[in-house]
Every structure is written in structure tokens, then in C-alpha cells.
């Protein structure tokens, strides 16, 4: 009898366990793997098959988490700066030609170190004064013969007037420029359109299973009723989706490329604002050259730039094609001596890969290590065994835009890479996010930045001596594809990134301000910009 009772108890217990497993799988398949600590990932992404996909990226199913609340908070701040500005006709939008720029307290000659202020009064194409702000302006002073340049600070009074302030860093003939990049009505349209859809870029996933090769559509969001592969970073609740090929497992994905989709969330009238003739139009007019002299002023002695120093606005200026910070001085540092004994992790997009290529070209003892990957986005490693220098570059996770095919076998989010780094005083991390996120709603970018922020918090807790450097996004080409790639999208990301990382001990290289000062409109800045970025980096770590 006791044996029979024991068997009954065992069967009851077994039934309860089976029921619990079935219920857990039904409610949350990822949680089951976490409970048993079983590997359920492919390249750090959990693979889950779904018959449909939500219309927005995956969020935790519980009540709003700290991440969701933080995203909401940042979005609310940005929304306040970019209110809706509907317009009935192009004539009612801001006109660079009819707007008025007035130099305050004009002088025949100015002195180095002075501040020059310009009041801008925005007017529409009918010459009417604008009653609200929000125009996207870019201010720059330059002396082409001296290969000198600096950005100007723009203050928006939200009533149709702006104060543009220039710090006069050098002597000579200086040209002043205030560009109307987009009128406030265009800014409002771009902001609305950006946050409206995830499908301006479509990705093609390449699956290989045996002798068969299949291509299917992939995206951050796929509005499809067919079965999908979900590549989920369960820790940060970030997902990427592909249509599941028939009879091919989700884990068989090997490569990807992307293409622009013929879709727009702008009206025909709004699109007229982004014709090339309406982008980056000069406000200053012809009377834009001033004369600056030394005036026998003493040049203030600045301390050497070092990690953690606060920066001014603007952050510096270009002189003879070399960057000069406003609040500190850059010491000449021998690159090889500085990097001796250091492990340098470069993470991000191709603007960080430019750093890798610069290091390899300037340190002739660095030897590339073949990691048996292919393509422009392959993980790169270069070492100098004698000097114990180790530099590596790794791309960030999805989204990665590129018409060329790239491997996704080893792709993972930057946060997961950081989580694997032990860190110590000779370990340096440099990361950058931005360009590949512009065509998608900004919550995608904010979520990724927050995941990197949390990973860095964990790293600095376990290894506070690790040095972390953030290189901000830079400006890019002024083409006709403003809905996807406008610098306005980059600027909002730049603002969000500075907000997110302000509480961490992170050195900042302000590539945005630098590329405005250099006057480059190139997603891949020229070598003199990369050299200046790396010079700041070397001063931070040595």
C-alpha cells in the first residue's frame, strides 16, 4: 500500500512539473531558459518563432519598467523642443532670404577672444515675422586661407528670434555663416514622420541550410501574418525579426544587406521643403566678413586636456586643420608610447572603424590578426606583441544599414560586448552610436543608448579604473534623402546621448561640434578630423 501511495504521489508530482513547464513556456519561453540557465541564444540573441510581430518593437510585458519611463522622459523633453508646426503653404514657412541677421554692437575691428553676437529675425516667404521658433540653424565662422573654423552657439527665444554667438578665436579676415538647415515647419514634419514608421529601410536576411540558400525580409518591425524568426536580446528587450524561410531554421541566418524602401510619411507639400534648394540656405547675405586683431590681449594659459574635464560651448576651433579645444590644451603625444600596454576596444559604426584604419596606418608595428571573417564590417584586431598593444574594432548590433552584404554570424549588441570585458586601468573603451539609427523612430536609438549606459555602469562598478570615451555622432552629406538621413535626426540623437551619459565618468569627444567647425559634410569625415579626434583621445588616456 505504501508503495502504491508513493507511486501515486510521484505521478501527481510529475503531472504538476509538466503542467508548470507547459504554462511557463506558454507565458514566457525566454524565462524558462533563464530558470534552467540553458543556452537559448544564437550569437547572444534568443531565437523565438512567432506567427506575427507587434507593430512596435518588443517591450517587457510587465508594467512600465525603469527603461520605459526613461525613454518616455527623454521623448517628452524632445517633444517640447519640437512642437507641431502645420502649415498651409510654402509661403508661410521660414525663408532664409527674407530673414534678417543683425550684428549687435558692430565694430570696424574686433579683438581675439571677444564674443560677437548676431540677432536673427525669422521671416516667412511673404516677409512676415515668424511668431515661433524651432528653425534648425547651423552657425559657423571660418577663414579658409588659414584652414580655420568654429561653430557658433544658437539660442532660440521661441518667438521667431535667435541669438547667434561666436567666440573670436583667431585673428584675420573671418567669414560668418548662419545656415537655415530646415525651417521649423520642416523640422516638425521630419520629427513626426521619423516617429511614425519603421519601414523606410528593409533588410534582406540570407539563410543557408545545407545546399539551399534563401533570402527573406527582415526588420526591427515586420507587420506580417507569416511565421517570423525573432532574434531577441532578452536582457535589454531589443528584438530584430526576419520572415522564417520554409523548412530552414532561424539559426541558419548568415548574412544581411539593406535597401531603401519606396515609402514616405511626409505629405507632398512637406516634401517640397526638402528639395536641395531649400536645404542649408544662407541667412547672412554678402556682408558677412569681419576683421579680427590680436589687440595686444594676453593669451590665457590653459591646462592640459585630461579625462573628465568639462567642455565649453563651442568646444573648440580648427586652426591650420588642427583641433584646439576651448577649455584646455592638447599636448603632443606619441601615439605608440601612449598605447603601450593598453587594450583598446573600439565599438560602433564605420566612423569608429576609421579610427582602426588610422591606427593601423600610423603605427607600422601593428599587425592585423586574421579572424576569418569577410566584408567591410568584419571584426578587426591589430596587435603589437613587443609593445603589448591590442586594438580591436567591432560593429554595433542591428540596425546596420548597408547595400553591401555583411556577416551577422557574430553580431551582438554593444552592451553584451561590454558585459564580457573585465576591465582595468589599461583597458580603454571608445564607443559611438548614431548614423544607422537615423531612419528609425528615435525610441530605438534611446533604448540602445540606455542599454549601453547600463552595461557601462556595471563595468565601472566592477572595474572603476577602466577608461570609457564616447565619440558623438558627426554631421553628414546634404543630399535629398532628408526624411531618412537629415542632420536634424542626428542632432536630436546627439542631444539624447549627452543627456543619457551625463551622469557617468565618461570622456566625451564632440565629433558633432568638430565636424561643424571643420565644415565637413561627410558621413566619413576626412583624415584631419579623425586625427584630431584621436589626438583628444590620446590626451584623455595618457
Curated annotation (Swiss-Prot):
What Gene3D superfamilies does this protein map onto?
A: Immunoglobulins
What InterPro entries has UniProt attached to this entry? Answer: Ig-like_fold (IPR013783), Ig_E-set (IPR014756), NXPE4_C (IPR057106), NXPH/NXPE (IPR026845)
- Domain of life, per UniProt, equals Eukaryota
> Which is one Gene Ontology cellular component term of this protein?
extracellular region
Alphabetized, the UniProt keywords read: Glycoprotein, Secreted, Signal
Q: So which residues have sugars stuck on them?
A: 91-92, 159, 223
A Pfam family found in this protein is Neurexophilin
Q: List the disulfide bonds.
A: none
Signal peptide segment: 1-26
- Indicate where this protein resides in the cell: Secreted
Give the similarity note: Belongs to the NXPE family.
Know the name of this protein? NXPE family member 4
Organism encoding this protein: Rattus norvegicus
